[in-house]
Amino acid sequence: PGVTVVANQKTINMIKQFFDFDIDARVMVVKEGDVLDTGKHKFTFVMAPMVHWPEVMVTYDSFDKTLYSADAFGTFGAINGKIFADEVNFESEWLPDARRYYTNIVGKYGTQVQALLKKAAGIDIGMICPLHGPVWRTNLNWYIDKYHTWSTYTPEEKAVLIVYASVYGDTENAA
């Protein structure tokens, strides 16, 4: 009814492809760097195409210093009542699923993730709210560094992978 859809042009085009209703009268198209001032909050829109989907943008609220990061910085797993990353032992309980999430959801778009990380470096971020997984309010640089490592395809540990097939076990013994 009285709703305004705030989205970038690519998102509007996609909505029109999937839904049959007049959206033009209810839309505010935003682009890179645009600011939506609601009084207390000022939302800045930052394009992050292919950080999972082609139309992705993240939103930064300068009042709360919160980055609404869409699929970036997300993870698989159930929250179970603890919505903040500092309320769980993230490194031991969540990091494997965060790595798997990165690999499966945005892993092939390392260049685009790097572009987003460069944009984010110039923003005073106090909290990261991804679409999936816990909210980050402490130790943000640790998790941002993980994304840097993963998006540059830098090995986290030194290792060697030995791939073999062994019908009778001799090759397995040699490996």
Question: Model regions: which residues?
Answer:
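Short alpha-helix adjacent to the SAM-binding motif of class I
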Residues: 14-18, 173-174
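Active-site metal-binding motif and surrounding structural segment of the metallo-beta-lactamase
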Residues: 1-5
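Redox- and metal-dependent alpha/beta enzyme cores, enriched for Fe-S-associated oxidoreductases
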Residues: 166-175
